Regions:
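Short, solvent-exposed secondary-structure boundary motifs
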Residues: 10-13, 40-46, 66-72, 92-97
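Short structured motifs
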Residues: 4-5, 16-17, 48-50, 62-64, ...
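Hydrophobic ligand-binding cavity/cleft-lining segments
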Residues: 1-58, 144
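Hydrophobic pocket/interface hotspot
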Residues: 30-34, 40, 63, 80, ...
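Hydrophobic-ligand binding "helix-grip"
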Residues: 68-112, 120
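Short N-terminal secondary-structure initiator segments
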Residues: 55-75
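A conserved amphipathic terminal alpha-helix motif
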Residues: 120-155
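Intrinsic-disorder/low-complexity, polar/charged segments enriched in Ser/Thr/Lys/Arg/Asp/Glu/Gln
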Residues: 14-22, 60-62, 75, 101, ...
Length: 155
């Protein structure tokens, strides 16, 4: 903790990483699966045991999510913002990872679709890295999630 004359400023650890994945499927189809948060519970229940949609307005939705990435388990409130077939952004607006941000950009290429993913994960309290898991393990677990989504896209 950092103490100032106006109070306490909390230090929140930030884990940032980027991933790139090529999927042999049309961008439109890949986007539909990756941004289909309301079916995560059915499509990839090992990562999302429960999803509850709180509100939807246009291309923006507020969703309550239970996310499991290896040893890291989070219950969070997130805002999904979609720009069809190009961009899917997730802003964590509540929970122990509040302030986290995930950006998925979908680029059409001759082989299919390239996904560029930027993850900025903020963890507080007992969730701090490396206590729960190290950054390389977190990247590996997130990559496993991407691999499972890739299988769905390519079938």
């Amino acid at each position: 903790m950092i103490y100032t004359h106006v109070g306490v400023v909390s230090k929140i650890p930030l884990t940032a990483f980027s991933l790139e994945k090529i999927i042999h499927a049309k961008r439109k189809d890949v986007f539909k699966i990756f941004s289909n948060y309301d079916d995560y519970e059915k499509l990839i229940p090992q990562y999302f045991p429960s999803i509850r949609i709180r509100s939807v307005r246009g291309n923006t939705a507020v969703v309550e999510e239970h996310l499991k990435l290896g040893d890291l388990e989070l219950v969070l409130m997130s805002k999904h913002v979609a720009t069809p077939f190009v961009l899917h952004e997730v802003y964590v607006i509540g929970g122990k990872s509040k302030g986290s941000y995930i950006k998925q950009e979908f680029v059409e290429i001759p082989e299919g679709t390239k996904i560029l993913i930027d993850v900025n994960l903020k963890l507080t309290g007992l969730m701090k890295i490396p206590k729960v898991l190290d950054k390389s393990k977190l990247i590996e677990n997130y990559s496993n999630l991407l691999n499972d989504l890739t299988i769905l896209c390519e079938n």
